[in-house]
Amino acid sequence: MKLRAYCVNLPSDEARRDHCIREYQKAGIAYEFIEAVDGREQDVQPDPALSIEQQKLWDNIDKTALSIGFFNRGTNSAERACAKSHALVWKRISEVSDAEKGVYFLVNEDDFNVLELGGLDKALNEAEDLNFDMIYLGYRGGNYHKSTPKERMQRIWHRMKWLLSDKSDIAKFRKNLILLGKARVHRQSQFFYHAGMTWGGHAYLLNRAGARKLLSYNENLRFLPDEAFRYAILDGQFSVGMSKVKYFGCDTQFGSALRSQEDHDAHHEMFPSD
């Protein structure tokens, strides 16, 4: 599979753009820049709901997200700008023709860097035969660890508890946090795990079906991009892989162009560069 990349970038940030061009040329990846939204210069707000039903859906998503501790309590303008910038790419991918419906496109933020190219071509070729909506090629946290006996017992308990539960979205998400929250072995894959609650939007593959699902979950810019990934996973309708090798990293030299600097610094303090 020959990669084509979309990179979100503020046109005013030529240093980042030049950095990305060098990284793409190093990896031999065809690329296109998508003009990012700057939430520091304007107050980015979501469009209003088009119907009562849509507003009810958004309210339920918010209520369910707040029941899981690691989701933010909404987003500020800079974070909504980040979400909207990724959504511009998702929309582009969601509109590809049927001939390209199974194609994975690489999505990058403009602080990505290339860590490893060895084995990438083989991994990409295998990805075409796997049923993932999205695949992390770079991520923070959520690395694979073999399950402990306690964790296996927890999964059995939560499956049983689900059979007796009221089947609410909150109950479903709490169950799936145990069942799907950690990286898991993919029995048919040499190069990928099933992803759990990992982090990062700097380098991921996305196909048409995955893009359409993400757009439906984050119409009101409720989530940062990687929060939308995790919410979709916990809803049980979004299949995500993660490469065993981290092919792409996140270069901290630039700070943050799309989110608040305070938020960006706190994130990288929690998840230092690999």
Language-model-derived ranges and their functions:
Residues 1-108, 112-274:
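An acidic/histidine-cluster motif and surrounding catalytic segment
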